[in-house]
Regions:
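Catalytic nucleophile-loop/oxyanion-hole region of alpha/beta-hydrolase
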Residues: 1-36, 217-219
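Alpha/beta-hydrolase-fold catalytic nucleophile elbow
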Residues: 38-40, 61-64, 203-204
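Glycine-rich nucleophile elbow surrounding the catalytic serine of serine-hydrolase chemistry
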Residues: 39-49
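Alpha/beta-hydrolase-fold enzymes
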Residues: 48-130
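Active-site nucleophile elbow and catalytic-triad environment of alpha/beta-hydrolase enzymes
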Residues: 69, 75-76, 146-164
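Short beta-strand/loop motif that positions the catalytic acidic residue
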Residues: 168, 174-176
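Conserved loop-alpha-helix segment in the C-terminal half of the alpha/beta-hydrolase fold
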Residues: 178-199
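Catalytic histidine-centered segment of alpha/beta-hydrolase-like enzymes
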Residues: 206-217
Length: 232
């Protein structure tokens, strides 16, 4: 996201609205009755959220999804799910906003840790193997380099997504790796979905980042069949 040419290093919290705009502006090029979306990682959760509000979306696939609002508010595996823990996060981020204003620049939170500690959790090692190697490194990638700005996730603390995912009538396919640390996001999301056009597909042996780029693991045939069926 850029304003006046200077990057904010912040996620677009209104991503579901952006997806809805695409559904509108692409109608001159595509069939408005056959709109499908795919979201990966954090955008997977946002894609489901978009499907909850935009009835033009007929099929949604979320790959190795994150619920960014949940992990921000509760920490990984909900280990920080308390009012006090959230208060401390708010306090720290709001204090940083004042510092950023005084400095005239955003402090960055840091991307994937480098060098990688020997005792790093396996999912951090998996991220390193993607973002810090030719697999996924890019000079402008925030995760590969300085990361998002420290205060960028503040609104996520106060804006839980997926609140009305149980009302999605269109088709949803959730795909997650068996060994992914983030698997619980898809499992929770699936438990809230209703209707026989919803599916959770667990890929045996796969971790979180395998579904980013591993061509022999990503279930392309399943994705093709899913969109073919529901975008007819």
């Amino acid at each position: 996201m850029r304003v006046g040419g200077r990057p904010f290093y912040t996620p677009i919290h209104e991503l579901p609205d952006v997806l809805d705009l695409h559904a509108s502006f692409f109608q001159t090029f595509n069939d408005p009755e056959r709109i499908g979306i795919i979201g990966i990682c954090g955008w997977g959760g946002m894609a489901i959220n978009a499907a909850a509000i935009d009835t033009r979306i007929k099929a949604t696939a979320a790959m190795t999804m994150y619920d960014m609002t949940r992990v921000t508010a509760n920490g990984y595996f909900d280990a920080e799910d308390s009012e006090q823990a959230r208060f401390e996060k708010k306090k720290a981020m709001n204090a940083q906003r004042t510092v950023d204003y005084k400095n005239g620049a955003y402090a960055l939170a840091g991307g994937v840790v480098d060098p990688l500690p020997e005792d790093a959790p396996q999912f951090v090692k998996d991220y390193y193997a993607y973002y810090k190697t030719p697999r996924g490194y890019h000079s402008r990638s925030l995760n590969s380099n300085g990361g998002w700005n420290v205060t960028s996730s503040l609104s996520f603390l106060n804006m839980p997504i997926l609140q009305y995912s149980n009302e999605i009538r269109s088709a949803v396919l959730l795909v997650h790796g068996e060994k992914a640390h983030s698997r619980y996001f898809s499992e929770t999301a699936y438990s809230k979905l209703t209707g026989d056009n919803k599916e959770l597909l667990i890929i045996p042996g796969a971790n979180h980042t395998d579904l980013y780029d591993q061509m022999d693991i990503i279930p392309f045939e399943k994705l093709n069949a899913f969109f073919t069926e529901y975008l007819r």
